[in-house]
């Protein structure tokens, strides 16, 4: 049974009713979709406020692009991009997630008021596991390869995430703090990406909440022919809805308003189904 509560520092998310939207806030010059758009602190705060108004309950702040081929930024640069934004958002009552793999940033973000650590390397960097365990924050672990078109990507991802969860538990992390991300768009073929999405039920067998991060990804662009990431909103919303229908409870997205509206319609249909079933049994 998948856990019903995700504990993230001072925030507890009830996952029984509807998915939680995590709005993406990249404070980078080179992120694949929105790099350079929110680098200045006032711009970042304004965009976060807009996303909150549109339905985002979590703001995911990233100071280093994780797109394939991106250049690693120095520690000091990531720190200067991320920590002031985290402090300002936390002061305004936001639930802040920080997309980082560096233990130094994890610890400073926790001190600055972050509630979630979102690590595409699943806390494998030296010191990251200990940094995560020393906090009470929510933790997201992600699978990203290595790329192998011949492997069973679903089972590979499931086993990898299971091992990383075991490492966190052994370090003293409570299971209610952990969420899984199968890593759509990371180290997978086009077909494997959609196998991971279709096999959401396999990951739910872990008992952990599932995070889906399909927003504006290149795989969606290849299917739709949309080379510009900004033109992939419709495909991104479709992917988010498919993930939600398959049990994903955290949706990491750029297009918050569109995703929120689509989820509202999906919920209305679900409630109509319940009423129809109830009448049929009466």
Residue spans for each PLM region:
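Short acidic capping loops at alpha-helix termini that bridge into adjacent secondary structure
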Residues: 174-177
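Active-site-adjacent loop and "lid" segments of alpha/beta metabolic enzymes
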Residues: 8-10, 16, 33-47, 66-95, ...
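Catalytic-pocket segment enriched in acidic/His residues
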Residues: 29
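Short coil-to-helix leader/linker segments, especially the first N-terminal amphipathic alpha-helix
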Residues: 1-11
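Catalytic domains of carbohydrate-active enzymes, especially glycoside hydrolases
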Residues: 46-62, 246
């Amino acid at each position: 049974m998948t856990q019903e509560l995700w504990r993230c520092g001072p925030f507890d998310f009830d996952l029984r009713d509807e998915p939680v939207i995590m709005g993406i806030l990249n404070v980078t010059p080179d992120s694949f979709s929105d790099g350079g758009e929110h680098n200045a602190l006032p711009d970042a705060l304004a965009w976060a406020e807009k996303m909150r108004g549109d339905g985002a309950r979590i703001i995911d702040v990233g100071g280093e692009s994780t797109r394939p081929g991106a250049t690693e930024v120095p520690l000091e640069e990531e720190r200067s991009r991320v920590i002031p934004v985290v402090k300002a958002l936390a002061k305004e009552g936001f639930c802040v997630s920080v997309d980082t793999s560096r233990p130094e940033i994890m610890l400073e973000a926790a001190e600055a008021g972050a509630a979630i650590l979102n690590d595409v390397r699943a806390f494998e960097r030296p010191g990251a596991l200990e940094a995560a365990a020393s906090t009470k924050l929510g933790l997201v672990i992600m699978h990203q390869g290595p790329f192998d078109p011949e492997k069973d990507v679903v089972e590979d991802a499931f086993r990898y995430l299971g091992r990383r969860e075991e490492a966190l538990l052994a370090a003293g992390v409570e299971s209610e703090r952990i969420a899984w991300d199968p890593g759509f768009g990371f180290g997978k073929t086009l077909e494997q990406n959609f196998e991971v999405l279709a096999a959401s039920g396999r990951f739910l067998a872990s008992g952990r909440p599932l995070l889906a991060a399909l927003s504006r990804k290149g795989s969606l662009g290849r299917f739709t022919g949309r080379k510009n990431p900004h033109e992939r909103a419709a495909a991104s919303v479709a992917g988010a809805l498919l993930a939600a229908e398959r049990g994903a409870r955290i949706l990491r997205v750029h297009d918050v308003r569109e995703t929120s509206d689509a989820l509202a319609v999906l919920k209305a249909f679900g409630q109509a189904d319940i009423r129809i079933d109830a009448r049929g049994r009466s």
